[in-house]
Amino acid sequence: MASQAANLWVLLGLGLAGILMLTKKLKKTVREDFGAFIDKLMLLPPPQPAPPKAPHPLTGLTFAVSDVFDITGYVTGFGHPDWVRTHEAASSTSPVVSTLVEGGATCVGKTVVDEFAFSISGENKHYDSPTNPAAPTRIPGGACSGAAVAVATNAVDFALGIDTVGGVRVPAGYCGVLGFKSSYGAISNTGIIPVSSSLDSVGWFARDPNTLRRVGHVLLQLPFATQRNPRQIILADDCFQLLKIPVDRITQVVTKSAEKLFGRQLLKHQNLETYFETKVPSLKEFARTKAIANTKVSTSRLLANVMQLLQRHEFLQNHGDWINTVKPAIDPVILSQVCENPELTNEETENLNAIRNETRVAIGSLLKDDGILVIPTLPAVPPKLGSKEITSEDYQNRASSLLSIASISGCCQVTVPLGHHEKCPISVSFIGRHGGDRFLLDTVQTMYPSLQEYSSIVTDPKSSKKAITKEESAEIAKEKGNQAFKEKLWQKAIGLYSEAIKLSDNNATYYSNRAAAYLELGGFLQAEEDCTKAITLDKKNVKAYLRRGTAREMLGDCKGAIEDFRYALVLEPNNKRASLSAERLRKFQ
């Protein structure tokens, strides 16, 4: 009692200032940890080599590892206390961790993962879920929530994770840091608890692209090589339609950055839905066996189904016996997903493997050695803590459709933060071909500064209006129209060219291009009208004369058509199309 009174007297003696100091100290402790760590430890790097040898490449950096990586003397917890209770401490350290320590980095702890590293929410009922420092009332994302939080709070310079169905990409996007998923098989999974053996890829988080790249070079054991720039940057238009936030808030940032660094000619647009329909034929067999062949299901949704099926099937292959023996308390959402999984026949397994291989080849064919595919990382800002949004069918469908592209193909992918929307982090993702990890890391390092420069467009709508003029938005619409035209989507092309005209109605090219699409649909009167407008704006627009000549010919106005083709020849004397058309029509006069 005397001791308690003394303590009370000391506390009172501190006065108001002292109480405030104690409060601030407590708050500081909470902020520094944010519930990211399971264990604090210290793995020190070896001594530096003697000069003239260079110091270790990761000298001075600290890192944490998600609690799926083995470290000698520690039980790898796998996000569940019953797993800890029924397993021994690791007798060896994961080669991935050892490589980083030998490379000069200091490992300072193990971080929280979702239960069995299975979910993408970042919430774990067995441990206090890490707090998202970028949006404390929102989920941090999983599976490797603690690792992302540790990086976001500056507790470490980088952190290791495992990415199966988004385990690194998702928390990076939700916490506003960089997250890299390596190509499947590029880094050994030895000493890592498997989730889904055909999907698991090592990944890592960092706050800056230089650290992300340094870590990648050590883990991937990359020799020195000249840095290469992309020669094509492809925006997957249909993927951006899955967004619940304004599409332009992301696409315009990427577009402006690419134009500034490499020029507008590198930018392309692709509809992955139609591309995968022809390039991944085994998806049709998958749809047939799952009795959804007669239902209109997008190829991206089918890929998501394949990813989820593989994850559940292989998870049970790896851990089903342990679950049946120990009977641990499992989160109902995870339990329902695992229990949904039926046994796969050999034929079905072969079909799933064929889909993986075909998807990898398809993306490789699309990107080649110098292309980057741009997609949203996630469909929306982080859901609120405790909400059912993350488990809703709509959210899961959208998210897994985006995440399945790199998971199924085994390609490398990086999450790049792009500021905030409604006070929550948002991001974009770049995908490189399988094995193109170095190229993707180089591209991120090159583009990151300009992406952050233009991310003010995302953060502040007012700055968006200043940074992106109507004329520039019109050009973006025109380019999308050109892509639709190439894909023979004439009506879509007309809509996009019309959008460009609405934004900037004094550009002859927009009218001339729309006329070309009208010609394909037999809209000869509309084509003639558009060409006339184009010629009014630009008297030397050869294509407008050629297209109006064609429209007039189809409308029976041979005299007008001949005049147009002749004028085109005045502008371009060697134009074969104009010459042949004029000569042909003269014979009928």
From Swiss-Prot:
Ranges annotated as spanning the membrane: 2-22, 142-162, 399-419
Annotated knockout phenotype: No visible phenotype.
Alphabetized UniProt keyword annotations: Chloroplast, Membrane, Plastid, Plastid outer membrane, Protein transport, Repeat, TPR repeat, Transmembrane, Transmembrane helix, Transport
GO biological process: protein transport
Tissue: Expressed in roots, cotyledons, leaves and flower buds.
Chloroplast intermembrane side: 1, 163-398
TPR repeats: 474-507, 508-541, 542-575
Record topology, Cytoplasmic segments: 23-141, 420-589
Membrane topology category: Multi-pass membrane protein
InterPro entries (alphabetical): Amidase_dom, AS_sf, TPR-like_helical_dom_sf, TPR_rpt
Keyword Protein transport: yes
Major localization listed first in the record, in broad terms: plastid
Subcellular localization: Plastid, Chloroplast outer membrane
Secretion signal, residue range per the UniProt entry: none
GO cellular component: chloroplast; chloroplast envelope; chloroplast outer membrane; cytosol; plastid
Tagged with keyword Metal-binding: no
A Pfam family per the record: Amidase
Superkingdom of the source species: Eukaryota
This protein's domain notes: The transmembrane domain and its C-terminal lysine-rich flanking region (LFR) (26-61) are both necessary and sufficient for targeting to the outer envelope membrane.
Function statement: Chaperone receptor mediating Hsp90-dependent protein targeting to chloroplasts. Bi-functional preprotein receptor acting on both sides of the membrane. Not essential for an efficient import of pre-proteins into plastids.
Description of how the protein assembles with itself and partners: Part of the Toc complex and of the intermembrane space complex.
Protein name: Outer envelope protein 64, chloroplastic
Species assigned in the record: Arabidopsis thaliana (Mouse-ear cress)
Gene: OEP64
